[in-house]
Amino acid sequence: MRVVSGIQPTGDLHLGNLLGAILRWVRMQDEAAPTDQHLFFLADLHALTVEVDPAQLRANIREMAAALIASGIDPDRSILFQQSAVREHAELAWVLQCTARMGWLNRMTQFKDKSGKNKEGASVGLFAYPVLQAADVLLYQATHVPVGDDQKQHIELARDIALKFNNDFETELFTVPEPFIGGGTAARVMSLRDGSAKMSKSDPSDMSRINLTDSDEAIAQKIRKARTDPEPMPSEPAGLDGRPEAKNLVGIYAAVTGGTIESVLADHHGQGFGSFKPALTDALVALIAPLRRRLVELRGDGAEIDRILAAGADKARVLAAPTIVEAYRVLGLTR
Ligand code: TYM
């Protein structure tokens, strides 16, 4: 098994990232067989596709690395690195841009969402973004790519690109990766203010998300203010249909406590959200507070974070190099 995944170093790590991706990365790392390999990276080249504040980006890279380590990524067992430090990502991305088709990228919903009404003003990088993401995983012959549901379409594109390249050049160079989306309730954590929007770093309202950096009081306040409805908790999952905010809070509680929607409803049905919310707050504080404390400690040692990232990049480069060499050979660029 070769597990590869990334996160953009923009803004704070939030509960959606944790449940949809990071805590699953940690579990895969912790349950790994000795021959499995895990590569996790800060997708800083992806962060260039929208407006860049260089000082902010520099700070965010360290902060996100510290947040991943605080969440349980162990640099001795996983390869943790900065995408831009391994040049092969950008190099392979170019090659794969010549394999991917305009029509495939035109179907990517994230570009439509992120460019909004201003398609003409969006960067070319924002459009080509999913091809760089394909390069990120194909470079390492990833077998499993653990991501939240919102990234599924991008991983499916990576599969299409791998298949077309292999087919066009009569090679088996690229392993076709599997998107590895969490089962249960964590694959798509929604905003606390709007059950139809996903929890996201880019939501202007901080009340919409729980951050790794939130104090216990901030978590309690956000849950207190989270949108719900006046109905009591149902006894069956079907009773959550048409109640996206209620469903989201039950889903979060299930994911955080290791339960299922059914088990949460079995314990809490008939209650109003006024009494469910304190239980949810306690569960979230129990999850977040220890990670936040570790993050604060790690922040104090920027040099150590830099050392970890540099060592990770050295290891990643060794794994990346043969893919580029072989890609250039089958393309006719080298003998
Ligand atoms: P990013 O930085 O937006 O998010 C990092 C991870 O968190 C997951 N996630 C969520 N999961 C559940 N509910 C949510 N509300 C939620 N919000 C975010 C994302 O699905 C993701 O797994 N393009 C990627 C980064 C990337 C990448 C890659 C991922 C670059 N190259 C190669 C995998 C493989 C992104 O912007 O994720």
State each model region's role:
Residues A65, G72, A100-G103, A142, ...:
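A generic secondary-structure signal for well-formed alpha-helical elements
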Residues G116-F165, F169, S191:
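Internal, conserved structured core segments that host functional sites
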Residues L15, Q153, R159-R335:
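Conserved nucleotide- and phosphate/pyrophosphate-binding catalytic cores
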Residues N60, E88, Q153-H154, E245:
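An acidic site on a long C-lobe helix of protein kinase domains
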Residues T10, A142, S205-M207:
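Short, solvent-exposed beta-strand edge segments and adjacent coil->beta transition regions
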Residues R2-A135, A283, V296:
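N-terminal Rossmann-like or analogous alpha/beta NTP/dinucleotide-binding catalytic cores
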Residues M102-N106, L139-P146, A254-V264, R292:
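Short helix-capping/linker segments at secondary-structure and domain boundaries
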